[in-house]
Curated annotation (Swiss-Prot):
Protein name per UniProt: U6-lycotoxin-Ls1b
Modification(s) after translation: Contains 4 disulfide bonds.
Keywords linked to the UniProt accession: Disulfide bond, Secreted, Signal, Toxin
Proregion positions: 22-25
Leader sequence segment: 1-21
Species name: Lycosa singoriensis
Length: 75
């Protein structure tokens, strides 16, 4: 019985530590790059990705944290 209670207590402590670590993770602010961590933009922002071309040749993808529900158009 003691072993069961001890095991339950250890599991509760471990889960609390994991939740606290996730809450401390810093978010990415507006207009900062989020290519490597797309799900880490601050609240109210989304990670929007674009394929970059140089002289018609694809040079990779870059992602930025932008405001939700905002659309950007080329000029």
């Amino acid at each position: 019985m003691k072993l069961l209670l001890f095991t339950a207590l250890v599991l509760v402590v471990i889960s609390l530590i994991e939740v606290e670590a996730e809450n401390e993770r810093a978010c990415i602010p507006l207009e900062k790059e989020c290519t490597k961590t797309p799900g880490n933009c601050c609240s109210g922002l989304k990670c929007d990705c674009y394929r970059r071309f140089e002289q018609g040749v694809a040079k990779g993808i870059q992602c930025w944290c932008i405001e939700k529900d905002v659309t950007y158009k080329g000029i």
